[in-house]
């Protein structure tokens, strides 16, 4: 985890932006437990693997959204309307990743008894992490940059 933090700070040149991404990663851990609860699955060793995978996926989604926002913000002063357009453009990449992940875990939900907790935790967690990246990252960017109307 320390290497992830160091890598994010070096890549983004910002402790605040790395903190935003890491907060999404921490939220994804809770989303994996929500997936276990919704799927009525027991928490065991297989269920322990899901938060680790979700952390990676949520960091990936967050980096994509934040890089699109930073790219646009470096060109000019960005308004809230322009920020929404940037996030909409980034949505395609994130949705593609999330749908392929869900498609991969769908057979495990229905066919596998052993991997069912992992599949439930990852599937619900991926949906939540995607929504978190698309909504939370822009909101935190607005707060940090103090963007007006």
Language-model segment annotations:
Residues 118, 123:
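Structured binding elements
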Residues 1-2:
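N-terminal membrane-entry
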Residues 112-117:
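Membrane-interface catalytic loops of GT-C/OST-like multi-pass glycosylation enzymes that act
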Residues 143-149:
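Membrane-proximal cytoplasmic C-terminal regulatory module of class A 7TM GPCRs
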Residues 7-78, 85-89, 98-110, 124, ...:
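Hydrophobic transmembrane alpha-helices and their membrane-interface caps
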């Amino acid at each position: 985890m320390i290497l992830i933090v160091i890598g994010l700070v070096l890549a983004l040149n910002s402790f605040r932006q790395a903190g935003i991404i890491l907060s999404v990663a921490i939220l994804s851990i809770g989303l994996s437990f929500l997936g276990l609860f919704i799927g009525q699955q027991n928490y065991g060793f297989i269920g322990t693997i899901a938060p680790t995978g979700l952390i990676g996926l949520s960091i990936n989604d967050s980096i994509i959204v934040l890089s699109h926002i930073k790219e646009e913000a470096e060109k000019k002063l960005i308004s809230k309307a322009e920020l929404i357009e940037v996030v909409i453009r980034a949505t395609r990449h994130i949705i593609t990743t999330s749908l392929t992940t869900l498609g991969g875990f769908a057979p495990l939900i229905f066919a596998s008894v052993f991997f069912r907790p992992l599949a439930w935790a990852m599937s619900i967690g991926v949906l939540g992490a995607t929504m978190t990246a698309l909504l939370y990252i822009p909101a935190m960017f607005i707060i940090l940059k103090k963007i007006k109307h």
